[in-house]
């Protein structure tokens, strides 16, 4: 029992010592949001009550986290890439930031500018977002 208490005490001291060497991030963490209308910011004009969940998301954080919502109505993973929207987001990402991805509703539409195939091009686009974010 004494041996276990000593081990726990040593572990806590080691954690305390290590935490002194962890560099604090000076900039806030940014959560980038990419997706379709389900996530997008909506106009508040003319009594519109519709909101994308990404529009409400910043209210759950302190000033240490910035939410940068790039989701747009009517976009698929394909159109988001082809319109250059992904390149804009990618150019802003720094180590320690996050990217939340929410596509699918428009990827299933038959229009060539939107359509992707599950298990093929849709998956490829999602992998691209993840791999390029990690790079």
Where are each of the predicted segments found?
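Solvent-exposed loop/turn segments at secondary-structure junctions
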Residues: 37-41, 72-79, 105-110
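Alpha-helical cap/lid subdomain in secreted, periplasmic
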Residues: 2-3, 25-26, 85-135
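Bacterial N-terminal signal peptides that target proteins for export
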Residues: 1-10
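Serine-esterase "nucleophile elbow" of acetyl-processing enzymes
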Residues: 22-71, 88-92, 99
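Short, solvent-exposed loop/turn segments at secondary-structure boundaries
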Residues: 43-47, 79-82, 112-117
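Bacterial N-terminal signal peptides
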Residues: 10-19
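Extended interaction regions within the primary functional domain
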Residues: 63-69, 79-83, 132
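Residues in and immediately flanking transmembrane alpha helices
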Residues: 18-20, 49, 115
């Amino acid at each position: 029992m004494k041996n276990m208490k000593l081990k726990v005490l040593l572990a806590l001291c080691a954690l305390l010592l290590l935490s002194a060497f962890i560099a604090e991030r000076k900039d806030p963490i940014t959560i980038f949001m990419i997706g379709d209308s389900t996530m997008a910011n909506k106009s508040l004009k003319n009594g519109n009550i519709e909101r994308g969940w990404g529009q409400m998301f910043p209210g759950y954080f302190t000033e240490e986290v910035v939410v940068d919502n790039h989701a747009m109505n009517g976009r698929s993973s394909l159109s988001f890439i082809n319109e250059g929207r992904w390149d804009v987001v990618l150019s802003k990402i720094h180590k320690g930031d996050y990217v939340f991805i929410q596509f699918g509703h428009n990827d299933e539409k038959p229009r060539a500018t939107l359509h992707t195939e599950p298990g093929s091009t849709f998956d490829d686009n999602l992998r691209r977002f993840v791999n390029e974010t990690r790079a």
